[in-house]
């Protein structure tokens, strides 16, 4: 077979043969096989050219995708599949990129966790979930998590939460709110509790009284329409307890309020 045309088409070249066959190849393919118009190639050479062209095209696409930011093996694999590249070729491209250090799931996991240590607010459970979604293996995630102590991150988040809620919630509700927020962010309950215990959070009696009377004003308006006497007192006690107020503070406030 003889090459009758080599014509540039955007990022690829159109190669035509005298038997009517056509295929798109990369510039790397032309260089590797020293292709030119009128060159004669065999069936075996054509197959080799086509396979390498697919590999070269896939690798170029992957490198373009990686040029914006680091990506995991799963992300690159999914990106290449959008371009209908043969699965075997995709695996070859991935293997080549891993060999050349363009893809390294271990380094990716370490970088994500390290960035979180410096400025993030996520605990190990949420990080594990996010990294797993990126296709990183459980063993790789666990291996990298062992390198870090999350107590400082938990403390940093706890301090921010304290600033947000202090003076707005009674002591028990403040503790519950901060610990719940920490566990939602991926910290274990024990780590969240330790972080809370390290806080300088003292809700004084005056603040508690101010908060409980403010809440009573709101709840009394709601429940006094339907209830009175003992039933009203019980309803108010229940709703205030759910809000995190101690029963002794509730009883004291109700004696004064009703």
Swiss-Prot record:
Which residues are listed as membrane-spanning?
none
User: Main localisation, per the record?
Assistant: cytoplasm
What domain of life?
A: Bacteria
Q: A Pfam family name for this chain? A: RecX_HTH2
Q: Where in the cell is it found?
A: Cytoplasm
Q: Which GO terms describe its cellular component?
A: cytoplasm
Name the Gene Ontology biological process terms. Answer: regulation of DNA repair
Keywords, A to Z, come to:
Cytoplasm
Q: What does this protein do?
A: Modulates RecA activity.
Q: Which family does it belong to?
A: Belongs to the RecX family.
Name assigned to this protein: Regulatory protein RecX
Instruction: Identify the species of origin.
Output: Streptococcus pneumoniae (strain Hungary19A-6)
The record's gene field reads recX
């Amino acid at each position: 077979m003889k090459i009758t045309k080599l014509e540039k088409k955007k990022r690829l070249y159109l190669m035509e043969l005298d038997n009517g066959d056509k295929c798109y190849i990369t510039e790397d393919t032309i260089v590797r096989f020293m292709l030119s118009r009128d060159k004669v190639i065999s069936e075996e050479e054509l197959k080799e050219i086509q396979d390498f062209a697919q590999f070269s095209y896939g690798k170029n696409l992957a490198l373009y995708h990686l040029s914006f930011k680091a990506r995991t093996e799963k992300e690159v694999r999914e990106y290449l599949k959008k371009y209908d590249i043969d699965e075997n070729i995709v695996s070859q491209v991935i293997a080549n990129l891993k060999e050349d250090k363009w893809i390294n799931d271990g380094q990716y996991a370490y970088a994500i966790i390290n960035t979180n240590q410096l400025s993030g607010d996520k605990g190990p459970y949420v990080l594990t979930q996010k990294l797993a979604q990126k296709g990183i293996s459980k063993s790789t995630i666990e291996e990298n998590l062992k390198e870090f102590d999350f107590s400082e991150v938990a403390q940093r988040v706890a301090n921010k939460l304290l600033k947000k809620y202090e003076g707005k919630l009674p002591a028990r509700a403040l503790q519950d709110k901060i610990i719940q927020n920490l566990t939602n962010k991926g910290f274990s309950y024990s780590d969240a509790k330790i972080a809370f215990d390290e806080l300088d959070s003292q809700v004084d009696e005056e603040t508690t009284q101010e908060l409980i009377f403010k809440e009573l004003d709101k709840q009394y308006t709601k429940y006094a329409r339907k209830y009175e006497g003992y039933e009203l007192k019980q309803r108010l006690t229940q709703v205030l307890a759910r809000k995190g107020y101690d029963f002794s503070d509730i009883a004291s406030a109700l004696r004064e309020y009703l």
